[in-house]
């Protein structure tokens, strides 16, 4: 008996007005709704919306008719285990139960507080959302009750062991229901040794299987024992005056359809939400009904509950004498041990009879098995005799077969020896003839070797004289070829030196630009700190202004001081605006310098690619020299030189003389300043132009696809040039050579208005376009609207790009080309 049931049992009222018997209280009054709900939560029983079970009938007069209907509809067969408790119900119940806390040992004086805490542990999560005032009142009551214990004659209760045992039994019962134990129903005696002997000697025969009862026979015997015919006659007599409409509910069909629908959707969200809603509504109604007598918020009510609990304990102890030496079977039933023994004997007697019957059958089966084992032993001995006789006969047959086999082998060996002797004499005569022929061939071979040695001596003398003459002529030709090739390499070396100088100058400029950027950033930080100081002064002035405006109504004499403060505030605000303007201008300058630095980097990358191209060409010319030396040629192959350079060696020297002034202008440091204009690169095969567009700042670099990583493009171009140079070194196919004879000028670079995924370089594109005839096309770039580089700009301007036509060479003459003009305007609006 719990403390909650003892307290609330006296004040609970029945809705029907009549008292009902209950197993929870000795007085016969039912528990409160809150106590019943908490007991259900504690033992895992949760009301599911899919199951609407009614306890009894609405009208007591119809109880007999309902019992008759249930008796006729009751199935007499024993069905398999069915889990009536919904698994989702236990999950929902666990979701609202608070986690169990470990209770420390408490003194006997704090019985009331321990009972309250144990009931609070089993409460749902909805009970935790109560106000802090409730918790404070509970704490004060616990302290007061523990400090001033109640004095009574009866000893104090300690129901911790009772609660622990109840919880343990409830957990075991729930575990048995959710995970039922699988019982192995074995026929025969349950003794282990006897069972092992039966397993070793028992065999199912057709007679035993035919004598086993079937499922149908079990069902028939169960129906005979249930007296179904008698119950049916009583049910027919009871149904004469039965009207099903009076018993059944009007909304029964709708509720049955709703129940079926919910059973189908047990795992859906709607069922869970409805279950949560029902639980919350139930908790709300309980809170509303018991608000005036809440257990944990009313100290006086708790004291009264403790006194009532002690009185009930005294009554139960006084009434314990009536049930002494008796066993409680539940439902208020107490029986003596003798009665229980008589009932047990009546129940166990049929079981013992069945055991005797089965043991008799088992003994008969053992006798049958013993007879069969004797027959089996006799048959086995007969089989062994037959096998021994068979083995003796087999040994005699094997001895005779062995003697016959030896005779046959001796005859065969004699015939084979005669044949072998005849064969040896025949082969010896053939070997003698072959030896005579071998001696004749050896004499012929010696004579042939002498003749060949004389011829080799004459050939060696002739070859030495020819090699000496050929070596002298090759040395003279090699000296002449080296002189010619050094003359060809002079312009390449000049271009390489100029490009390296230009590269070093660009690196110096890059360092200066980075220093300027760092200085400007430092100044920006200083201005920002100054702006913050001015903001602080403005705040102080504003506070002072507010205080002075309040004092203006009281003191008219401070009007002039207030005016001076306002003027100083305006001056500080003007200084702040000035500093902000300086910061914005310096930030714009920093961004423009970053743009110049990016342009400078692109120009350095462009010069690096040009240097690599020229070095690769020098390597290829050296390789062509080595090829000419190996082939003993005076000059380099003009066809390959034309395929590589675009012109012959003579035309190339003439064009290099015209290119020298342009290379000097390129090496001028005044022309190498970072600007947004295009850079003109003089190639080795003519004037090849490449536009280097102004790069956007770092935070807008993703909007332009024309400037990607130069290292990847550089590696790719180097691989392409190496592959094409190897192709030039080993020569071309005849079809390719015919096409390359028409190509006298490399294809000019085309500038596409769309952003390219590769960096813009001024490399010679004849390696990739050997089989394509040159086409001179002029592409016009339309002005595109690009974002400005300032964070304070109010708009964007057009970047106008004008590109002239690429240079074309016709008939070995070179036409002058116009310079590329690319201007990037950065408009700053403050």
UniProtKB/Swiss-Prot annotation:
* Membrane topology of this protein: Peripheral membrane protein
Q: Name one GO biological process term.
A: eisosome assembly
Its predominant location is cytoplasm
Record's InterPro entries? Eisosome1
Compositionally biased, Low complexity: which spans?
128-148, 741-761
Native organism: Kluyveromyces lactis (strain ATCC 8585 / CBS 2359 / DSM 70799 / NBRC 1267 / NRRL Y-1140 / WM37) (Yeast)
Family, similarity comment = Belongs to the EIS1 family.
* Residues annotated as signal peptide: none
Q: Name one Pfam family in it.
A: Eisosome1
Q: Where is the composition biased (Basic and acidic residues)?
A: 810-830
An annotated GO cellular component of this protein is: plasma membrane
Q: What keywords does the record list, in alphabetical order?
A: Cell membrane, Membrane
Q: Residue ranges of region Disordered?
A: 1-29, 128-156, 650-830
**What protein does this entry describe?**
Eisosome protein 1
Q: Where does the protein end up?
A: Cytoplasmic granule; Cell membrane
Please explain the role this protein plays, according to its UniProt record: Required for normal formation of eisosomes, large cytoplasmic protein assemblies that localize to specialized domains on plasma membrane and mark the site of endocytosis.
Where are the membrane-spanning stretches? none
């Amino acid at each position: 008996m719990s403390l909650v049931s003892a307290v609330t049992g006296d004040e609970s009222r029945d809705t029907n007005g009549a008292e009902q018997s209950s197993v929870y209280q000795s007085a016969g009054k039912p528990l409160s709704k809150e106590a019943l709900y908490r007991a259900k939560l504690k033992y895992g029983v949760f009301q599911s919306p899919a199951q609407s079970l009614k306890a009894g009938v609405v009208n007591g007069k119809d109880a007999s008719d309902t019992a008759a209907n249930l008796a006729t509809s009751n199935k007499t067969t024993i069905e398999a285990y069915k889990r009536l408790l919904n698994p989702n119900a236990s999950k929902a119940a666990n979701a609202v139960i608070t986690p169990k806390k470990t209770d420390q040992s408490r003194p006997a004086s704090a019985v009331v507080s321990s009972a309250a805490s144990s009931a609070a542990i089993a409460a749902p999560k909805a009970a935790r959302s109560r106000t802090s005032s409730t918790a404070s009142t509970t704490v004060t009551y616990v302290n007061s009750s523990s400090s001033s214990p109640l004095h009574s004659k009866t000893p104090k209760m300690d129901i911790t062991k009772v609660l622990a045992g109840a919880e343990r039994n409830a957990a075991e019962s729930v575990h048995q229901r959710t995970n039922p134990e699988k019982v192995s129903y074995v026929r025969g005696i349950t003794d282990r040794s006897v069972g092992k002997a039966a397993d070793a000697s028992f065999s199912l025969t057709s007679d035993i299987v035919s004598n086993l009862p079937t499922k149908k026979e079990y069902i028939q015997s169960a129906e005979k024992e249930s007296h179904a015919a008698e119950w049916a006659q009583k049910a027919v007599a009871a149904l004469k005056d039965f009207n099903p409409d009076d018993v059944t509910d009007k909304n029964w069909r709708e509720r049955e359809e709703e129940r079926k629908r919910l059973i189908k959707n047990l795992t859906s969200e709607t069922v869970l939400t409805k279950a949560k809603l029902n639980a919350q509504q139930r908790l709300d109604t309980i809170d509303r009904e018991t608000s005036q007598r809440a257990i944990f918020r009313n100290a006086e009510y708790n004291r009264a509950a403790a006194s009532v609990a002690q009185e009930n304990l005294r009554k139960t102890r006084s009434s314990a004498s009536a049930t002494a030496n008796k066993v409680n079977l539940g439902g208020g039933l107490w029986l003596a041990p003798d009665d229980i023994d008589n009932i047990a004997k009546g129940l166990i007697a049929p079981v013992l009879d069945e055991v005797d019957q089965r043991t008799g059958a088992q003994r008969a089966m053992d006798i049958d098995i013993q007879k069969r084992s004797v027959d089996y032993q006799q048959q086995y001995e007969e089989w062994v005799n037959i096998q021994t006789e068979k083995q003796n006969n087999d040994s005699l047959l094997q001895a005779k077969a062995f003697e016959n086999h030896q005779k046959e082998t001796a005859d065969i060996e004699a015939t084979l020896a005669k044949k072998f002797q005849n064969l040896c004499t025949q082969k010896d005569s053939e070997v003698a003839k072959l030896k005579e022929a071998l001696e004749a061939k050896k004499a012929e071979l010696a004579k042939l070797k002498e003749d060949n040695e004389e011829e080799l001596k004459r050939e060696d003398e002739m070859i030495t004289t020819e090699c000496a003459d050929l070596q002298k002529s090759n040395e003279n030709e090699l000296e002449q070829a080296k002189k010619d090739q050094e003359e060809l390499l002079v312009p390449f070396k000049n271009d390489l030196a100029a490009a390296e100088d230009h590269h070093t100058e660009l690196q110096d400029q890059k360092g200066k630009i980075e220093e300027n950027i760092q200085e400007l950033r430092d100044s920006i930080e200083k201005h920002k700190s100054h702006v913050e100081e001015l903001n602080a002064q403005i705040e102080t002035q504003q506070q002072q202004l507010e205080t002075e405006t309040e004092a203006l109504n009281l003191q008219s004499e401070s009007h002039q001081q207030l005016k001076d403060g306002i003027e100083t505030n305006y001056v500080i605000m003007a200084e702040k605006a000035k500093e902000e303007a300086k910061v914005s201008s310096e930030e714009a300058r920093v961004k423009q310098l970053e743009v110049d630095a990016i342009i400078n980097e692109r120009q350095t990358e462009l010069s690096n690619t040009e240097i690599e191209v020229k070095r690769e060409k020098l390597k290829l010319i050296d390789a062509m020299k080595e090829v000419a030396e190996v082939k003993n040629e005076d000059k380099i192959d003009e066809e390959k030189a034309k395929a590589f350079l675009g012109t012959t060696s003579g035309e190339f020297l003439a064009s290099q003389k015209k290119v020298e002034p342009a290379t000097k202008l390129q090496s001028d440091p005044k022309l190498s300043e970072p600007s947004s204009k295009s850079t003109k690169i003089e190639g080795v095969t003519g004037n090849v132009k490449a536009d280097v567009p102004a790069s956007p700042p770092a935070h807008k670099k993703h909007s332009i696809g024309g400037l990607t990583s130069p290292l990847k493009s550089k590696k790719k171009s180097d691989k392409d040039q190496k592959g094409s140079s190897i192709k030039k070194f080993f020569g071309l196919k005849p079809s390719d050579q015919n096409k390359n004879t028409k190509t006298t000028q490399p294809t000019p670079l085309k500038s596409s208005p769309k952003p390219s995924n590769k960096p813009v370089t001024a490399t010679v594109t004849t390696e990739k376009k050997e089989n394509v005839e040159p086409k001179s096309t002029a592409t016009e770039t339309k002005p595109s609207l690009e974002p400005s580089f300032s964070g304070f700009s109010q708009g964007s301007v057009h970047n106008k790009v004008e590109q002239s036509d690429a240079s074309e060479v016709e008939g070995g003459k070179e036409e002058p080309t116009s310079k590329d003009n690319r201007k990037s305007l950065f408009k700053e609006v403050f």
